[in-house]
Structures are given as C-alpha cells and as structure tokens.
C-alpha cells in the first residue's frame, strides 16, 4: 500500500484542499454534482457539427452517434472572462487553449484554486508540482496532421492544425500538464501519466507521493480527455464496448443485467493536494485526507481482464487500513467483463459486508483518461455531503454481480471514508482511499 498518512510526521499527511471539474453537464463541479443527484444524463445524440465524419460514423454504427460532449466555445469564453486581468493566463490560453483537452484542464484548474481559497498570485509563490495526464494526445490535431501530410487536406484554419503551437500544444500528450505549469509558474516536478482509463487516479497517487516524500508542498493533479471522435467511437464499436441502445441516455447501465457497453464522454478533473502542514500554515482547514493508494497490473491482455477479480481484490486488500470503507466509487463501465471483474473483486474482499457503491458513467459517459479524476471529485463531494449517489440506469440487478448499489439517492451522514477504483486498458488497476475528518 502507498500510505500518505504518518503519525510520526503528520505535517506530511496529504490533504485535498480544492477541486474542479468540466463535463458534459457544465463547466463546474457543482453543476456535475447537481446533475448526478437528480439522476440526469449528459449523453445526447450528436449533430454533424459536433463530431467529425458524422455520415460515415452513423452508417457504420447503424444509428445516430451519441456522446457527452463539452462545448469548446463556452470553455474558452469562460477562460477569457476569468483570466481577463492576468497577462500570464491570457498568454497560456493563446498558446494552449485552442485544443479542448487543454482548455478544459485550465478551466478545471481555476475552479480547483478557487475552492482551495487560492488566487493565482498566491499559488505562484508555492513549492508546487504538477501531475496531470491524458489517455492520448489531441485526436483532432493528429487526424488533421495526417490528413494534411497525406495530401487529403490543405489550407487548415489557424486555431487547429495551422496554429503555430500545434506540435507542442496538441500533438504532445503532456500539453495539458505544461499548460498548468505555465499558468502557475510551477517549478517543481512535472509528470504526465498516460494509463488509459486509470490515468486520472494514477496522477493523484503520483502527486500524493511527491508531497508525502517532502519534494513539494502543493501538487496539482488530475486528467482530461476529449475523445468524442469518429475514430474512437468506431474502434469501441468494433471492440463491442460501445452501447448500441436506441435511447442514448439509458445506454450505459453499470452492473445491470441488460448492460451492453458505454458512451464516450469528454471532461477534465483537477484537484489541489497539499501537505497538511502547508494547508494549516496558510490557514486553510482541510477535512479530506488521501489516506493511501494501491496500483497493480492485470497482465491478462490489452483489453481482456481477469474475470475472477483477483487483482481488484489485491488492490482493495492494500487499501485496507483497519477501518471498513463506508463507500465505494466503482469504475463501472457497463461492459460485461469490467463489471463482472469489479463485482467479483469487491465480493472477494468484503464478503457479504459490501459497502454502498456507485458509478457515474451512466450519467457522464465514459470520460476515458479523465474518468478517474472526475470520479474522485464526485467521491469527495459524496463523502463530504454524506450521500450515496444513484447509479444511473441501474434497474435490473445482474445476479452474477453481487453489489450494494441503489438507483435512488440515499443520505448517509455517517460516511467518513471512500475508496475509488479505476481500471484501464493494458491492465492498469488502481485504488485510492480517502478519509474525512470529524
């Protein structure tokens, strides 16, 4: 287990002081929370101006393409408003903001700073690191680059491939991490984990390690992803993991007996981690601690997974710290193998005493590289507010998935701890344990 709490050195305990999120529900974590509490769905049928190659994709899928997308124009408008008086911020948006992954990351970061009670000027004075990842570079930039170099497209407009910073600010996967460092003048270690759908949670663990080891006092962590592209959706359809439901809002059904896959979602989640001592010295009361984490590999295959849940069980075993988890935020993709594996792992670890669990992909879509960080933001809110969220579209329990899941919101003020699970293609299996102080 990766432990981030030490009785001998309590000042090095890792606390969460702020968070922000951008999703198909809106440009803030509060909009996301309100939508989840009211059982809304962000997945919608897409119009031709929302996704490339709409006609060909619709023909291939044999239905109208659907996803939970984020409006780049609204994101940029919000960034320009929030950074109108900050010259550094304006230059960062000019250099990086033309790509949706970067712009969502920056907007989520600004919200995270606000909830942490920090201004940009204050944050720029800290000994700060930055661990922000994504599952892939900008697909739009890659596809446009390929189209141009293969002679199929020319005269691409400035702001996409024609932008002078396209190579460094879109084609390289660490662009979103570098954008955060530029905005914050962060000179501590910078990392960009790329671990498929476990990217966000791995970023949190890596940042927590930097703080607990005394390398930095503050670390920006999280991830972003914008994969509502024809190439991704066609590939997932061929893999058999994209939902074929006629009603896209009810397509993704985690742990439901009628589940048949997920819909793609876009988004970003950013958290501010600090050492407990640093947060205390600046007068900030932090009630959420990152107690520990676990990070293992399932070597079964690129997209295959061990259905017994043995690796998931091992991750949960390592997260155990003598106290039962009050709540689990599961990965819950709504695919047959993932949900079976998770359910088996939870049952092997907890036995008949399964804690309440929930998953949000039926509402948000699968955010892929952004899933772990956005879902951790939601898990923190659930723990702070004492709420077990409904698992959207969970109607008929799969008898092969022994789970403690509800389709309606439940109030549980006694929640003091939450465990978050993330799984990713390639065998990434990650867990994180959070505690709330009384």
Residue ranges of predicted features:
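Condensing-enzyme catalytic core mediating Claisen C-C bond formation in acyl metabolism
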Residues: 9, 13-17, 40-45, 247-327
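Phosphate/pyrophosphate-binding loops at sites that engage ATP/ADP/AMP, CoA/4′-phosphopantetheine
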Residues: 58, 79-87, 110-128, 279-286, ...
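Acyl-CoA/ACP chain-elongation machinery
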Residues: 215-260, 293-306, 330-339, 354-403
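Glycine-/small-residue-rich "gating" segment that lines the acyl/pantetheine channel
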Residues: 45, 152-164, 205, 209, ...
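Active-site nucleophile and cofactor-binding loops and adjacent substrate-binding regions
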Residues: 97-102, 123-125, 160-173, 191-199, ...
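ACP-dependent fatty acid/polyketide chain-elongation machinery
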Residues: 1-94, 277-289, 377-392, 430-438
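Active-site-proximal gating segment of KS-fold condensing enzymes and close homologs
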Residues: 131-191, 233, 238-240, 338-352
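Active-site-proximal alpha-helical scaffold in enzymes
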Residues: 105-119, 173-177, 184, 190-224, ...
């Amino acid at each position: 287990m990766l432990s981030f709490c030490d009785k001998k050195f309590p000042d090095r305990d890792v606390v969460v002081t702020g968070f922000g999120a951008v999703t198909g529900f809106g440009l803030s974590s509060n909009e996301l929370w309100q939508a989840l509490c009211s059982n809304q769905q962000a997945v919608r049928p897409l119009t031709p101006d929302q996704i490339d190659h709409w006609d060909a994709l619709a023909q291939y899928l044999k239905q109208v393409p659907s996803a939970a997308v984020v409006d780049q124009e609204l994101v940029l408008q919000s960034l320009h408003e929030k950074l109108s008086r900050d010259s550094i911020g304006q230059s960062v948006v000019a250099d990086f903001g033309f790509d949706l992954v970067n712009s969502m990351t920056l907007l989520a970061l600004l919200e995270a700073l606000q909830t942490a009670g920090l201004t940009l000027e204050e944050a720029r004075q800290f000994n700060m690191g930055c661990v922000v990842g994504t599952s892939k570079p900008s697909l739009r930039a890659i596809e446009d680059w390929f189209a141009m170099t293969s002679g199929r497209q020319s005269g691409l407009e400035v702001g996409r491939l024609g932008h002078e910073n396209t190579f460094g600010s879109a084609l390289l996967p660490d662009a979103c991490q570098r954008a955060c460092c530029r905005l914050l003048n962060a000179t501590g270690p910078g990392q960009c984990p790329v671990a498929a759908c476990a990217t966000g949670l791995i970023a949190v663990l890596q940042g927590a390690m930097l703080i607990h080891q005394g390398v930095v006092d503050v670390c920006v962590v999280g991830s972003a992803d914008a994969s509502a592209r024809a190439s991704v959706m066609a590939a997932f359809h061929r893999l058999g993991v994209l939902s074929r439901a006629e009603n896209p809002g009810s397509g993704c059904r985690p742990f439901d007996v009628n589940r048949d896959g997920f819909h793609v979602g876009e988004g970003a989640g950013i958290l501010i981690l600090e050492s407990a001592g640093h947060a205390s010295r600046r007068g900030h009361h932090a009630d959420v601690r990152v107690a520990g984490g676990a990070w293992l590999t399932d070597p079964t295959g690129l997209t295959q997974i061990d259905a017994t849940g043995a690796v998931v069980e091992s991750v949960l075993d390592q997260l155990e710290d003598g106290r039962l988890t009050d709540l689990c935020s599961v990965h819950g993709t709504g695919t047959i193998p993932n949900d079976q594996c998770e359910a088996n792992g939870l049952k092997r670890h907890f036995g008949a005493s399964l804690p309440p669990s929930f998953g949000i992909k039926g509402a948000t879509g699968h955010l892929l590289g952004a899933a772990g960080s956005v879902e951790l933001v939601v898990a923190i809110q659930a723990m702070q507010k004492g709420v077990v969220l409904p698992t959207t579209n969970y109607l008929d329990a799969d008898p092969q998935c022994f789970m403690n899941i509800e389709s309606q919101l439940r109030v549980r003020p006694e929640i003091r701890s939450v465990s978050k699970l993330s799984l990713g293609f390639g065998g990434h299996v990650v867990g994180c344990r959070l505690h709330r102080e009384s």
